[in-house]
Each structure stands twice: as structure tokens, then as C-alpha cells.
Amino acid sequence: MSYRTNSQTYNTLSIRGITPPAAGGSSTVGFYMDNMPITDSANGGIRQSMGTIFDIERIEVLKGPQGTLYGEGAMGGNIRYITNKPDPSGLDYSVRVNGESISESDGISTVTNGMINIPIADRLAARIVGYRRDRNGVIDQVAPRSEEDVDTVDETGVRAMVSFYPTDEAEISLLYNRVKAEYGGPGLGYHCFNVGTPSDPNGQVPIYDLPGTTCAGEYDVYNSGDPYVTHLGHPTFTSGGDDEQEMLNLSISWDLPFGATLTSSTTQFDRKSQYSEETSPRFAAGVQGIVDASCFGLNPACVPGTLWSMGGDGLFANQTDRFAQELRLVSNTNSDWQWTLGAYYKDEDNTQNDLDACTVGGSPVYDTFEENCYLQYGFDPAVSIDDQRSVIQTLTAFIPGNRIYKNLTEESVYGELSYTFNEQWEALVGLRYARVGYGLENGSAGSNVRSEVDLSLQNDTTSTSPKFTLTWRPQADLMLYATWSNGFRPGIINPGVVARLAELAPLTAEDPIAKGHYDFLESKKLVDGDEANNIEIGIKATVADGKVSFTGSLYNIDWKDMIIAYDYSTNDVFGLTPFTVDLIENAGGAESQGLEFEIRAELADNWNLNVGGDFNWTAEITDATALSGAAASGRYGGVGISEGNRLANAPKNSFYASLTYDFSARSFDAQARLDGYHVAESWNTANNERPAPSYQTIDGRVTFYKENWKIGAYIRNIADEIIVYEFNQVGFRYGRPRTVGFEVS
């Protein structure tokens, strides 16, 4: 499993190399908290919130296509947090405080977690968990504005559960979870220099003349220097944003008298996030070109240099409202027959404002700008407020912006049936049938009013996903299995195509070029779903009198009709928005093959070793004929997507090892631990334009225990390795530098 942060609010989560190459569809990885689905399904999983790992009983990671155990099916796998439940037997509480100093950052970052378990009656209890994370940044902005540690994170959250146990066979739990985060920025290090692309020397980041900047401290993956700086800095622009999530779940579990457990899970999920981040000067140059083309000569306020040339505004605003209901019936007897039956319903509304209208309906007026207006902070400070108002009034008449409204509904049934033939052999079959509806409404240009829509589309798909597993246990401490499973993502609608079709429609009668674009994009409005077929052979064994355990699996995933995004240009038609269209299409196919393993060994008294890793030797596009060498969406340079390209965020290998030693120190029990990690080079996009280099880190920790107290000290990234998660024309996204911390609980 791979998890990395690509900006302050964008995260990438993948299992076995199955990473969504395009936003907008369902995530390839499902996410649960207990029985509550919290998957980022509207954005392809790129904004998945992970929450805090405190007062958690365990974390389950189910790899490969999942769809026959839980309602929220996924093509790559499922992750599930199992929380500790309220306990009526007695009062309990815990507190954990972390303080840490991050290299390249001033001050102390802190994380505070707390839990209290309150018995209310003999069979009724409440458990409340709260936390606050205050993390200092490491990125420094340089001239023309000097500001240090700008990529801050301030996050608070609460998880409260009330559980009632009316009988020994029944449980009713109400779970409320709320997270609120505020982010500083930018979270990217943009460096004003020219860096050639290793795979294509012609695909380069342009050199920009940045006034007031000497470009001291350049850094790239091949040269040394200070990486944690950004050569951006509008004199008045402030990057940052916020993310607020609220989740409410009612879960009822009942052990029925005929040998089965019935579970009902009802979930309401609401999320609102908005973020504005300075990005590369390329975006500012593009917007300045719009100013020049659309109103220069017609409006005297529109002159070259109106906008600040050192950075553009990367903006999004997103709102999600989801209701989900799941019923699951699972056998709980010792019979040779075991089974699971389930039904799932989901209704999700999503509003996106990647290019928000600058007014709340009506004529553009500066005083009524929405806070997400994409031009609001882009002007050179020397331009007067009156001229800014005049320019935006002209531009919003030409490019008014709009909102996109999405609706995702799913009705599915699923189940598994297994039979144990004898002590050695067991067979399992599973099936999932899903009916998914994906609707999209394109808001009228210049309007933020929900009822004003100029185009509505609907894409309905059905899928059947089977699963087969054969298990052999030749002896009590050895198990081998073989699995074939299928995962499916539903079809979606091209949001960028919808808006461009509305612009092209009035021009098709007289302009044959516009007609050609219109016909092509009309055929691309609806995108079929993609699917993955997984073959897996695995082993689980225990040897040396239980002192060594081993798990391993070989997997082969055939990804068909893969959904991918690329840029499509209509710049040869006069009068259209001069932006390319982010076109989503079923590009062809991909394949992922590899070996996963984990070894746990007791080396000697008090010494334990854990080693694990993944060899993902094949993770490549096998069919790209539908793309014809197109450039991946949102990236600079014409490096095409081709057969043989490696899938995004899929390193060829990754390993970890941890060594622990338990000892006594005066009146304390203690443990010393050393962890090492290696992640090979990977690509951030399917066109393999620029790689994120490999990295290795070593962490160390010493912890002392006494009664209910635990005191520890740790160092993460001991060697202060420069970790580059992403490298493209927007900048560098880094992992944490050396961090020295303490923990008391």
C-alpha cells in the first residue's frame, strides 16, 4: 500500500499500483471507519482524509478487488479503521501529548490526543476521543515577500460514540466524527531554474524572469542546495484554505437465533473544503494572456502587466453531501458452511468550483465577489481597486465561470459462500451486483444559483463482480490459497466536456472547425467504467515453534478500459475559453504484477525483527491506442502517454524493516526500536514526464513504560534525507525532514 501527500489537501492512496490516473470517478481504494464508509468517491480518491490513529483497536487492509464483504466496493482494495468501543464496565481515560522539532522549521509542532470512556448505565456507555494537531511548516517564501514556514497545518477533531447493549446479543451504536483543518501555503517548493526531463530533454520547466529574486538556493534531484524554499510570492496573496467534515453513523448489530449476525449501518457524511495555493508562473502567464486577448484595446484598464507574473492561483472549492445505508447478514456458527449477504445504497451530491464564478449571480460587482473568485488575488498591487473591478467585469463577461453539480447513486447486493470440505480444503465463491447512476449538471455561466443549469447528463451502468478462492491447509501452521477476483469502477461524465460543448454549440452552424470539435466532444460526454481482474497466490506459515511467521502473495492484475485524463485543445476556434479541456477517456489497459511479503521473527530473548516489502516489477500501460501520445492532463511539456509507460505512483520496489529490543531500566520496562524504509523511483503521471526519486529513511525510538505511563523520544528521518514525493512544473512536494520529538501518555 502506498500513501503520499501531493499538496496540502491532495493525497494519493494506492494498493498494488492501482492508482486513479484521473480525478472525478470513484476511488480505487475504499475506506471505512467501523461500519461507516468515508471513501472520497467524488474525486477519484485524491482527497481522501485519513484522520487520527488514536484509540484504534486495529487497522484492516484488504488488498485486491473488494466487493463481496462490504458495501463500499473498490477495485484496488479496502482500508478499515476498527475503533475501540464504549465499555459500560468502568471509567477509563487516556491522554497522549507529542511535541517535536522539525528541521528547517522554527518552533515546536504539537499533537494532543485524549480519550474518556464514561459508563452511563449497566448496558450503556459513551466514549469520546478528541485531538489537535498543530504542525509548523518547512517551506520558506523568498523575494519579493519574505515569509518562513508557510505550509502549516492546524487540525482539530472529535470522535464520539454512544453504545447501548440491550442484551448480550445486541448492540446499538451512534457515532459522530468531526474534523476541521486549516492549511497554510503554498505547500510546494517552486524553484526558478531550468530542469531537463530525464526521459525527454525537450520537456522542460521554462525559466522565468522573476523580479527581485536572485534564484539563490536552486535545488533539483541532481544538484545540491536548499530545497525548502519557493520562488513565488505575490506581495499580498495568501495561500491556504480549510477542510471541514462531519459524519454521523447509526450502527445496529444483532445476533439472530438461527446462527447469523445482522448489521445495519446508516451514514450521513458532509464535507466542505476550499483551498487556494500559489502555483507556477505558467498559470499566471496564461491568465495574463486572457486579459490581453479579451479586453486589451477595448477596456483601457486591461494592459500588459495587470496581473502579477510570479505565480498563478491554484484554486478549488468542493462540497459533498452523502447518505449511505448498508445491511449485512453474516453467519456465526461452527458449520462447514459460512456465508455473507449484504445490500448497499448510496446517494451522494457533490458541487465543484475548480473555476468558480466571481459573483453570486447577477452582474459582476467587485463588492460581491465570492471568496473563491479565481482572479481576486491575482492583480499587481499597483493596479487600483477601480481598475481591478473594471478588468474583472470585462473578464467575467468573457469567461464567467460556473459550477458543476454531480450526483452519484449506487444500489448493490453482494455475498460470499464458503464450504470446508475437511481439515485441509476450503472453497469460497462471492458475487457483487451493482447498479450505479452518475449525473452531472453544468451550471449556467456566471451563475452560482443551483436552479440555473444549462446542460444535464446521466450515465447509468451495471456491473457483476465475481470472486473465487481455494484454500489448502496441509498442516496446522501452513496455509496456501489461490484467488481470482474482479473489481469495477462505474462510468462517469466528462465535466470539462460539458462546459466546452455549451460554448461550442452556438458556433457549429457557421464554423466547420467548431462543428468538428463539437462532434468529437459530444461522443466523449459519457465515459465507460473500468475493471480489474486479479489473480493471487498466497501463503501464510509459522515455523520454529511459532517464533517465525511468514506471509506472501504473488499477484497479477489486468486493468481493462482504464480511465485516464489528458489535455484536448480547441484553441483553433475563435471566441472560446483559451484553456485546454481536461478530457477523461477509457485509454486502454494496464497490468500490475508483483510479490508482497512480510516476515516476523523472534531472533532471541527480547529481540524481534519485522521485514516486509513489495516487488511491483510490472505496473505499466499495455494499451494506449486511444490516446495517440496525448499529454497527461495538468502537466507541462509534450511527453506522451505511451504503451510501456509505468503507472503513476507505483514504485518498482519498496521495503521496510523494524528491529526492537525490550529491556529494563531501573523501575521501568523499556523498548528500543529502529525502523528503516526504502521506496524506489516512481512517476507522478502516466506520461512518465518527471520521476519522483527513490529515497531511504531511518527512524529511531526509545520508550519507557511504568504502570499507566508511557514516555518516549524519537527521531524520524535520522539522516535528514530529502524526500521528493512529487516533481513537476508546479514545483516539488516534500516529505518531512528530520524530526526530533517526545511523547508522553
Regions found by a protein language model. Give the residues of each.
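Short acidic/polar hinge/loop motifs at secondary-structure boundaries
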Residues: M36-K63
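Structural signature of Gram-negative outer-membrane beta-barrels, strongest in the C-terminal barrel
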Residues: S163-T167, L329-N332, G342-K346, I404-I557, ...
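Membrane-embedded beta-barrel scaffold of Gram-negative outer-membrane proteins
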Residues: N113, S251-P257, T261-T267, K272-T279, ...
